[in-house]
Structures are given as structure tokens and as C-alpha cells.
Amino acid sequence: MKCLLVIDMQEDYLGNSRDVKRYPYKSKELIHSINNKILEYPNESIIYIVNRFFWEIGRKPKKLVDGLSVISNNVFEKRMPSCFSNKKLLEHLQKIDASELELVGVDGNYCVGASAIDGINNQYKILFNASLVGVGDYNKFIRTKKKLEKMGVVFTS
């Protein structure tokens, strides 16, 4: 099964009250484009990932960004850059017989990039949809992209 992993599309990275210097993404465009991609997948194959650092455990749960189409209950939390650090996500992917994963979200240099690497290491075919991945530092992303391509990540747009 082919799945769409929507990574870190949450209020603190893309919402109106975010630190824009730290998270300079074109939020509205990215949300709109990802919503269009979500429409291409059956509900059960859409998986949302939220990032919650260990020091945030006592706080409110992370909220997906307003405006993002949330059409499945497949929401997994992670505490490390790679979404594959969540064992429940790995179990879910095995249960639904996932073999190909399209990654979208933020940031291409960090969590989406780390998830792409771990996805390859976990024997998944990884599609990195560059037009649907927010990147804060494009100069760094040139190096990140080369590394990912070398590992076998397939870039699409």
C-alpha cells in the first residue's frame, strides 16, 4: 500500500503565532498544496505525524495547523526527528502492509529528511515530494538532497 505521511504540519511551525524567523515557510501555500495531495489518497492511507519534544510532555498535546485537511484518525506523535522513532507507527505501517511512503510537511533538512533516511533504512520506498516540503535553509537543503538521493530517496514534485 502507498501511504502519505504528513509530517510536523502543526500550529507551532506553521500557524499565525509561530516564530516566522525560525519557521519561514509559506504556510498558506504549503497547507493548500498538501490539502490537494491529501485528496489523492484514501483516508486510511493518510498518516499525520506531530512533533512533541520530551520537555513538552507535560503541556497540551500538539495541534495540527488550522486549515489542514485532517481526514483520518491516523495521528502519531514523535519525540525524535524521524517519525520512525515511534514504534506504534512502525507497527501500523506493517499492519496495513505499507511499502511506499510519500513524505510531505516540514522541514526538509530536519524531520522530513530524517524520516526519509529512516524510511529507506526500514526498507520502504520513499517519495520525497519537494514541492510539498517546507525548507527553512535552501543552501543546506542542496546538501541534504544529495545525501537523500544517494541513499535511494526518490524526489518528485
Regions found by a protein language model. Name each.
Residues L68-F76, G136-S157:
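Structural recognition of alpha->loop->beta junctions
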Residues H32-L39, Y110-N121:
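Histidine-anchored nucleotide/phosphate-binding helix
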Residues N73-C83, S131-L132:
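A short, structured active-site edge motif that brings together acidic residues
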Residues A98, V104-N109:
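Active-site neighborhoods of divalent-metal-dependent phosphate/nucleic-acid chemistry enzymes
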Residues M1-V75, L90-E91, K95-I96, V154:
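Active-site acidic carboxylates
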Residues E102-G105, Y124-Y138:
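A short glycine-rich beta-strand->turn/loop micro-motif centered on a GG-aromatic cluster
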Residues A98, Y124-K125, V153:
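Short phosphate-binding/catalytic loops that engage adenosine nucleotides
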